[in-house]
């Protein structure tokens, strides 16, 4: 499995991300051609790279020269521009996710509907180039999972189209929900909205660099040269091959203290029938020592709102919490096997030195009922014969 780890010790911005990926070995033509697919006048901008250094460390810079004044753009304009382009589906999907997270954050900060969000700096050609360029570079590398370290907040103020705002800018702060941060990097803006959106949209998890075999390192330089540390985003490319499968999920939780067990059982069945990957109840004590249950539902990211609405509709909960999570799974497939009890479906599970079979519950129940055998005995026979 190919992964990227973003070492954001000095922060992250859109241009630093593209620069680090170019430094990692992505051909400049990949980024240039991807941006060239969009409905942007080619005379209005030019792209370039250059070698530079920050505190003695050599790095790549990605530079967008804008020749003309660029209009403000609504979120819908940018989404349509990407969707109607001839970009590969993988690039479109990544770029759309990033811009959606940006628009979502801007809408919340400014109290407007998603469709009315104006992108000022973000809508300019340089930021569109950063996002589409990053999506194209990641797609070219064939990356299957992205991880990142804690992000430095920075301090002070930054000048924006909305005036002088505190660091991190409000949209950046909104995008940092669920992402570990720290305040050790020094003054100035260390994380831009575009940089935060890239990680918020694409990263499967955050924390120390995971165990992997490093296959490449790229360093992308920021525009400014900080006095305290090198203004560089460092990206590690690596391989993980432990027989695991990885994907991204969303965990939805609700605390419920006044719904009957019968209703709760029904809600679990509804969640699973609606496509939830897992659902569980656990006991807890709430305020005033009231006994209650925590409903935990694991879903694919695109199912989040549907399942959250189901929980709010079917229970007495007045709110739910959710957070993104990475999932690590052993490989599995379902096979039919011949046994002395007849044909039985089993899950064949393997990976990272693990190899076992798990009989399908429904098939074992059917055999136990047909033959008048204890269910445990059916399980033992199937496991013994199919595990050989």
Curated annotation (Swiss-Prot):
GO molecular function, a single term: nickel cation binding
Listed Pfam families: Ni_insertion
Keyword check for Cytoplasm: no
Classification via InterPro entries: Ni_insertion (IPR002822)
Keyword terms, alphabetized: Nickel
Family: Belongs to the LarC family.
Protein's recorded name: Putative nickel insertion protein
Species, as recorded: Geobacter sulfurreducens (strain ATCC 51573 / DSM 12127 / PCA)
Source organism phylogeny: Bacteria, Pseudomonadati, Thermodesulfobacteriota, Desulfuromonadia, Geobacterales
